[in-house]
């Protein structure tokens, strides 16, 4: 084993934050220093040249001053017996660089601790701060890392002596293994194995427990019900299915697959042809798939990993729909208990304590969103929708006084995708079909996730809780998705017959489900399962929940095609079994020469006992909420600090929202990028204005007073949100319903039944809405003991609705951005019809009240009329702005619109009934619309035709100053400056950013928000955006070949290909594996573009691993060097491609002054809209664009330009090779955050070679080449945005 020192692992402010965590434990630690250490397992001593390559390979990242090692060494390494995702990717790079004697690379982090002597307890506490016990170990000597390369012998299975010891043996195993089997399931298993005449193996019991857990089987939703002695006619699931029976319109797949499918658009899907890899449009039906999952239990234990794998699992559900499909855009949501942000605690936030095994709500929101965002970012899916609610309060509800809240959080992960009509249904699994596991290896993690998720928090052993959390590797999932994409792109020749994702229960659930759903049995070989921990037992190999895996069946005659696709994408797979005619499951173990599983599928899946719920309903005992003594000024500021109302930028800018180039509406609105959008919208393709929309609705605290109302409000809010998009027919909208409840808690079961009936039997059929997909989580309760005795925090019954719909014209989507042009009116449409019910409102929450009566959907017809009226107004382009009324009421709706429009307001409450507090802060459904004053009659007529005249009120207009005024009958009711409200609204985000990211950047961003003169994003162009300079060359009919270059983990190649295709190029998909295998030569191409993403997951530095696999591979180096030397060629590197090409500068003529790119100053992934200025440089891409200033999408974690020498910046400026610079909204070159999102010196965002043929840039022009793909744009831009000019300039350059 070789030991190689690396760079310092922590920046100054990260070290400071770690020290603060250690000081909070009162440990006598004075200082620490952290450094990466690399370990190489080699098969033979490396020659000098190889050693030099290895040294260079492991030198990466930013320059940080090295320090002397002193103090106690604590070396954090991956858990012994595992192979980390870092290791597998770094080893791949080493092999691609020709280091064949390097068998494996691994990385640790050496902490040198300056401390007084530590006792054993203190040492354990310190180690717990420094490492993640799920995936890491701590040793005290560098040579101890050699355990990383030792392999244990496989461990045998164990059997449970049911035949000899009877039922008690199984009861004991149930507790020991954390199986969560019900009493009747224990009886069923005892009976089944007595009939088989043998004892069950542990693996068989575990497999049964996972497959039949509440998490997987949804036993409560399929149960028979008796409520208050009355037998109920339907199960919960049947009431949900009732919506489909009443309205099956536009639904192509429901309840039968990993996701539901609905009718979408007809447009041109853009992907490469199989025969020559050239991209082209394929005009066909582009149907919409939809799925929303929850990952609550793991997120309470390990927030980053729980949320990351929650998103990853949901993405796999989408990709595994039908015979393979394409995830497109994501959403995420969180409900947690009170944040109690250190230094920003709020008056309503009492601390009721928590058990040790779960983390705090603050920790969940500090790390969980990062996990969800990181997975989506690296996979390459834009995350463009979300919600965030906190609730934790002692209330008097149905069960008397108790604490209700989200100690067990809701972590929502969902999204939409697209699927070919021909692949919507699963195919036939033929007898003899190869049963394949695609994706990463088995590791001993995530055991028992399904069963653990099915228990109330506190019922299981703490070690089992930790064992049930999975770990993520999104770059692997991206490779798998590329394989699935290549399969469905073959159309009728798609080799995938049947596909499922691997989730809860691992292969033990996925493979039996696959063959059972396909009507087959199977014979499997345990030792064919790819395995990174050979020492695992058969149970651990078969049942672990290692992520990024799919199972599928492929006919033997198509296996060669599938194998070739996987090889090109470097996606590992294995044939694990074969499908059989007999519905029997056999698992052979060649190592121990036995059969760990040998049972009929019917025993596993067919006849488990059906649940019966016999429950009682509870009467309400709430008290009215008295608002008469509330100070309105204080109430307004409290509400603006409540997370459900407050600004959520800290949850949004961490997530890529522009990847794919198909995002039309993300959360950020207008020139000031205010996060207030009601709906997320994507375009169906690059050649259409049709698209897809999704929105969220949830009013969970209302369930503490009225279960049915809470459910109806969730549906209503999803509709008032999606109404901002151009949908048309209400039947075009389909819903996902995610149900969370504390089953067994007094009154909650009957309440759940009431809520499901309210939407499934009543509201949705009345509206013509269908719920074709959903999920339930029935153990939303946390129990523990402390010095004060038994404690519990029980979640409200929680329904989260996601609405999905096909969009007719994405350009018509409305936002809350008020226009300040002309004479306009603001109108409130009040679907509560003046009732102003205040129960369970945000105002009640911030005063620690609950109230008695909640808002409700009293008239489905009124809600339907509202939706149709707004749709007509959208279609006729009669409105300037739209914002629904929700958390915080009318006050919040209006101030958010004022923030988006950067304007003051004059609001008159005269037309609104009731007291001022209720008028301002009630959360009845409704919306505020803005329109030209001279269109009042047109608007009135449309509202009247839909039955809304009596609930629609003109309430005011914009003010000429910065004040937001509310008055009644000429008397002031509430008034403050927009600046005061804007600052208050920003505080939650600001404090979370300060504690999570670089505090200096957080301070700079707050200062930017408080700059009331900030002119916002704008465009000042030096050229005519409507001119197509490439048209004369395209007319010649010659399309120069353009290499759209990608490496494993790259995710922005399709939109790049589309941009060059539009400019007249023949865009060709080129994988690095094509070049390394000699299948493709760069001599065929006149242009090359290295695309954005996360090559090799950014191990060994962003883009550096990719570059070094070229520099240190003789064949690849020669290919690229020859290409760059040819005078008639050009090259472009964007984002990850920019990072990569900057590390190839030794091969690129005239690029010697280029920097490389390192971690952003914020030390956070930054997804922003930034202003760029095009400089006067030789770049062929920016000819005629010099002096232009315009917005562009930015999405990267390592974009800060760093020069090797201190004189590097000056040399770059002197050589005129800086092509692009970040400017602020005043148009000045800036290093200030967030206008400069990464802290690059002199605002550097792009550079060129001295002859202009090679250009690199961190921002993403390919994602915004269409005007509709820009988060904000001037009204006069047409189809093409100004960034399209640079691609056309490249075509002009070739002549």
Swiss-Prot record:
Pfam families: AIRS_C, FGAR-AT_linker, FGAR-AT_N, FGAR-AT_PurM_N-like, GATase_5. ATP binds at residues 306-317, 677, 886. Keywords: ATP-binding, Cytoplasm, Glutamine amidotransferase, Ligase, Magnesium, Metal-binding, Nucleotide-binding, Purine biosynthesis. GO terms for cellular component: cytoplasm. GO terms for biological process: 'de novo' IMP biosynthetic process. GO terms for molecular function: ATP binding; metal ion binding; phosphoribosylformylglycinamidine synthase activity. Residues 302-327 are annotated as: Disordered. It is found in: Cytoplasm. Pathway: Purine metabolism; IMP biosynthesis via de novo pathway; 5-amino-1-(5-phospho-D-ribosyl)imidazole from N(2)-formyl-N(1)-(5-phospho-D-ribosyl)glycinamide: step 1/2. SMART domains: GATase_5. Transmembrane segments: none annotated. InterPro entries: Class_I_gatase-like, FGAR-AT_N, FGAR-AT_PurM_N-like, PurL_large, PurL_linker, PurM-like_C_dom, PurM-like_C_sf, PurM-like_N_sf. The active site is at 1135 (nucleophile), 1260, 1262. PANTHER family: PHOSPHORIBOSYLFORMYLGLYCINAMIDINE SYNTHASE. In the N-terminal section; belongs to the FGAMS family. Phosphoribosylformylglycinamidine synthase involved in the purines biosynthetic pathway. Catalyzes the ATP-dependent conversion of formylglycinamide ribonucleotide (FGAR) and glutamine to yield formylglycinamidine ribonucleotide (FGAM) and glutamate. Monomer. This is Phosphoribosylformylglycinamidine synthase. It comes from Pseudoalteromonas atlantica (strain T6c / ATCC BAA-1087).
